[in-house]
């Protein structure tokens, strides 16, 4: 009998490779005889590094090439940071597995200052995220936001070389790369609401590939699935991409889901925050309802302005 094989499409960055190898080790833990191959590749978002992400344009900057590999039969699954995954999938593909979420916070990283509040007037902060930018500027309009691209090591090197007074990164990425010592402080969600799906790893697969989906089942985390379902439902209703100032974060306790949402202008002068609570079985509807509340308060106009300037 021929051993089963799974081919994993992944980005080539150190963090993406860590995530793919993590999925490989998890699969082998549950299926010791499985053959698992990695297929590293570069995406559009990896190649175009001299332009802010919001200006590159299009959805799926970090996933499209991986999806093509699945559709063409070169790969069976793709491993993603869920915050990079668009709300719409190519026909026949879906997020069939969502793994247990790591820390979803944004991390403040600096060699000289302990937190955002301590930065001097006119300090230079590095990020490529409009979501982080709008929330930082809402708190500290005096701060200068400077675009920051590249993998985690590249971004840290730029900080260490003095290009920035501080940079903002996803805490989960630093933890996965065993660089938690570089986290100066975690930023509270009240200050910087995380991105939709931040800290969670998802697996994309052909929806008709029942054999592969069955192999992936032990990697599914039901609690994370509920939380991500609510966050992504909000984002879908808002028609938000990965490069827009939208934040969402769900907490699940005793079957009660607490969902926060945010839409802001790029300059931080307008920020709409809403929250909603309900039963976990209504995760999708809670996300939709929260988005409708945000839209009723002017989110549509803010997002239209963002898209117009991209």
From Swiss-Prot:
Keywords: Porphyrin biosynthesis, Transferase
Family, as annotated: Belongs to the HMBS family.
S-(dipyrrolylmethanemethyl)cysteine found at: 242
Any one GO molecular function term: hydroxymethylbilane synthase activity
Source species: Psychromonas ingrahamii (strain DSM 17664 / CCUG 51855 / 37)
InterPro entries, per database record: HemC (IPR000860), Porphobilin_deaminase_cofac_BS (IPR022419), Porphobilin_deaminase_N (IPR022417), Porphobilinogen_deaminase_C (IPR022418), Porphobilinogen_deaminase_C_sf (IPR036803)
Matches recorded under Pfam families: Porphobil_deam, Porphobil_deamC
Higher taxonomy: Bacteria, Pseudomonadati, Pseudomonadota, Gammaproteobacteria, Alteromonadales
PROSITE patterns to which the protein is assigned, alphabetical: PORPHOBILINOGEN_DEAM (PS00533)
Additional information: The porphobilinogen subunits are added to the dipyrromethane group.
Record-given protein name: Porphobilinogen deaminase
């Amino acid at each position: 009998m021929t051993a089963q094989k799974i081919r994993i499409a992944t980005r080539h960055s150190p963090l993406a490779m860590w995530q793919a190898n993590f999925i490989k080790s998890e699969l082998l833990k549950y299926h010791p005889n499985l053959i698992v191959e990695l297929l590293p590749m570069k995406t559009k978002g990896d190649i175009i590094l001299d332009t802010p992400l919001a200006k590159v344009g299009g959805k799926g900057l970090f996933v499209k090439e991986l999806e093509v590999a699945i559709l063409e039969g070169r790969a069976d699954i793709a491993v993603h940071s869920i915050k990079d995954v668009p709300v719409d999938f190519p026909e026949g593909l879906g997020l069939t597995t969502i793994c247990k979420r790591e820390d979803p916070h944004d991390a403040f990283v600096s060699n000289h200052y302990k937190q955002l509040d301590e930065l001097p007037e006119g300090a230079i902060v590095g990020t490529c995220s409009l979501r982080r930018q709008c929330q930082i500027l809402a708190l500290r309009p005096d701060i200068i936001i400077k675009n920051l691209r590249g993998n985690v090591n590249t971004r840290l090197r730029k900080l260490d070389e003095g290009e920035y007074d501080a940079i903002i990164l996803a805490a989960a990425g630093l933890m996965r790369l065993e660089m938690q010592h570089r986290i100066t402080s975690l930023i509270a969600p009240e200050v910087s609401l995380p991105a939709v799906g931040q800290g969670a790893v998802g697996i994309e697969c052909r929806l008709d590939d029942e054999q592969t989906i069955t192999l992936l089942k032990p990697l599914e985390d039901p609690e994370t699935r509920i939380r991500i379902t609510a966050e992504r439902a909000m984002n879908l209703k808002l028609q938000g991409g990965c490069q827009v100032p939208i934040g969402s974060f769900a907490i699940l306790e005793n079957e009660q889901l607490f969902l926060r949402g945010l839409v802001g202008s790029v300059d931080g002068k307008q920020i709409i925050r809403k929250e909603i609570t309900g039963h976990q079985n209504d995760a999708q509807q809670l996300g939709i309802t929260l988005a409708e509340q945000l839209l009723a308060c002017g989110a549509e106009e803010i997002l239209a302005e963002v898209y117009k300037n991209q």
